[in-house]
From Swiss-Prot:
Cofactor: Mg(2+); Zn(2+)
Reported function: Catalyzes the hydrolysis of the adenine ring of phosphoribosyl-AMP.
Keyword Amino-acid biosynthesis: yes
Name the UniProt record assigns to this protein: Phosphoribosyl-AMP cyclohydrolase
This protein's UniProt keywords: Amino-acid biosynthesis, Cytoplasm, Histidine biosynthesis, Hydrolase, Magnesium, Metal-binding, Zinc
SUPFAM superfamilies: HisI-like (SSF141734)
């Protein structure tokens, strides 16, 4: 007889970050840290979003890109409603402890507009400009 493991909650607020990792973070006054999201295959920067300790803990536990929406004041598990899922392969903290780099396999667009990346297709400065 097989035993099904307890399903993982879809509520990031129920997850607590390991205290050793939490001690390394330098959160802003709102308790958030910027997360730069990069494609594992192309190294293209896909988006920047915010995480709190619960979103980071959930991401580390589930390998699902999870962020905190400041405008909606809620957690955002990338792809939960859009299907544009981020399978997280790596998470690294920068040398100052104030930014995380999240490397992902991106399904569909990373941007809420549906585009592959959130960064402007019409750059402010580029080669030859």
């Amino acid at each position: 007889m097989s035993h099904d493991p307890t399903p993982i909650s879809d509520n990031p607020a129920e997850f607590t970050l390991d205290p050793v990792i939490a001690a390394r973070l330098k959160l802003n006054d709102a308790g958030l840290i910027p997360a730069v999201v990069q494609a594992v295959d192309t190294r293209e920067v896909l988006m920047m979003a915010w995480m709190d300790t619960h979103a980071l803990a959930y991401t580390l536990a589930t390998r699902r890109g999870t962020y905190y929406s400041r405008s909606r004041d809620e957690y955002w598990i990338k792809g939960l409603t859009s299907g544009n899922v981020q399978e997280v392969t790596d998470v690294a903290l920068d040398c100052d402890g104030d930014t995380v780099l999240v490397t992902v396999h991106q399904t569909g667009g990373a941007c809420h507009t549906g585009a592959r990346t959130c960064f402007d297709a019409d750059p402010l400065l580029g080669p030859g400009q």
